[in-house]
Amino acid sequence: MSLCTSSHKDFSQLLPLQDIGCNKTEIKNSPAGVISPAPYSCNQSTLTAEHSPVYIPSSYMESRHEYSTMAFCSPAMVNYNIASNFGDPEAVAARQTSSPGALWSAPGHLSPLSLHCQSSLLYAEQPKSLWCEARPMEPVLPGSRETLKRKTNGNDCTSPIANNPGSKKDAHFCAVCSDYASGYHYGVWSCEGCKAFFKRSIQGHNDYICPATNQCTIDKNRRKSCQACRLRKCYEVGMMKCGSRRERCGYRILRSHRGAEERVHCLGRARRYSEAATRVKEILLSTVSPEQFVLTLLEAEPPHVLVSRPSKPFTEASMMMSLTKLADKELVHMIGWAKKIPGFIDLSLYDQVRLLESCWMEVLMIGLMWRSIDHPGKLIFAPDLVLDRDEGKCVEGILEIFDMLLAMTSRFRELKLQHKEYLCVKAMILLNSSMFPLSAEEPESNRKLHHLLNVVTEALVWVIAKSGIPSQQQTTRLANLLMLLSHVRHASNKGMEHLLSMKCKNVVPVYDLLLEMLNAHTLRGQRKPLATHPEFGPLEQMEPGESLRKGEPQ
């Protein structure tokens, strides 16, 4: 036999192998932990040989003997025949001794065969070599980071992940649910699911409530079971709203500081632009032709207001109720009309409010005169509310006011007042109603007001000139129209006094915008002494503005 080339005493037992026979199909009683060779039949003379080499353990190489490589495939390859007396104890002992397991080291020693096997085959599936030791597969949990590192860095051939070409040796894990992390999100390593959940929570409503005790386990399989505990764990592991990295947070803080500086710079630049825009508007207003100005006034005219006519016979309460309702509706449209006059909104808010509070009754009365100019003896308050002088007798003190209105309407009828002239006169009443000291704190607004009044006067002169009358008569007509403005103001003062008396007698309730305008007229007379005191400015005396804001049509 050519198993060894020396006569060492430990291998003298291999000599009787030539005399041992067997009529069984497999070898039994192999040492524990060693897989027996593939079964073979004694009747076969020759078996197919598997040419995978078997190596002698390193412990035997330490001795001074050299052993050749051999393959244990069949009895024919080791040049012996199995004897027929299989039941002989000596044969059994010899057969046990001749087991290939005798050439291996103790079970605690790592098999040298595994060191020479291809790592991809060992880690991908069970070893296919006939003589590889069988070891149970250890399950590797993806959620355990330490286990995965130990399996990856070690030489354990049972790990299915360590040497798998598709595995993630440098993978990071989600700090919330221990799943594979997709990146560094909101300050920690996290998966796509936890990143999206945290983003939704900080951007929307996050009033989650735990149905249990706020101690739910959050892992890969149970992360969707409780939103409250999942969000709590997100904050516990360090997820933050400011960004994904600290340096990004610092960059955003720096960017916010730069943004504040830019905003301050932009505010200063916007202020300069506003001043320049104001000068441009003044230039444009000065270049507006009278014809264009009149056309703008024509487009700004408010619509007709309807009011339910009280049932006859009229009573003092029913007539005053209809008149106050009509006045309140017209005041709303009056504010919109004033804002459409070119240059009016460029005035300060203080001047806008004071002008409206001073002339609102005059504007209402001249509108009434224009509607009644073609109806002698009638006052057309609204298309559905037409009154004559006799119907005003039911209201105490209003008959005098009716007579004044009818007289002024008759005078406008004699002058054959044109529509464009009426538009200019009404705008002049608004802008010339400054019977109060203008704001000394805003001289720019006062200058704008005077300039705007000049523009309206030029427009009225242009309208009279376009009528075709001689130039001398044009001057006379302008004077006649302007003289009527004093009568309109006198009538408005009478009307204001009458309305106040009706309110004090509780004849008619006054509400909304009309009440504010009426109160402003009353308070102006009471606060006159404050105007001379150096500590009080006009704005502190009146505090106007509510009527303009509440009365503005939406």
From Swiss-Prot:
Intracellular or extracellular location(s): Nucleus
Organism the protein comes from: Sturnus vulgaris
Protein name as it appears in the record: Estrogen receptor beta
Signal peptide: none
Known role: Binds estrogens with an affinity similar to that of ER-alpha, and activates expression of reporter genes containing estrogen response elements (ERE) in an estrogen-dependent manner. Locally synthesized estrogens may act via ER beta, in addition to ER alpha, to mediate seasonal or developmental effects on nearby song nuclei.
Record comment regarding domains: Composed of three domains: a modulating N-terminal domain, a DNA-binding domain and a C-terminal ligand-binding domain.
Region Disordered, residue ranges: 529-554
PANTHER family named in the record: KNIRPS-RELATED PROTEIN-RELATED
Tissue expression per record: Brain, pituitary, skeletal muscle, liver, adrenal, kidney, intestine and ovary.
One example GO MF annotation: nuclear estrogen receptor activity
DNA-binding region, residue intervals: 174-239
Any single GO CC term annotated in Swiss-Prot or TrEMBL for this entry: nucleus
Pfam families, alphabetized: ERbeta_N, Hormone_recep, zf-C4
Matching Gene3D superfamilies: Erythroid Transcription Factor GATA-1, subunit A, Retinoid X Receptor
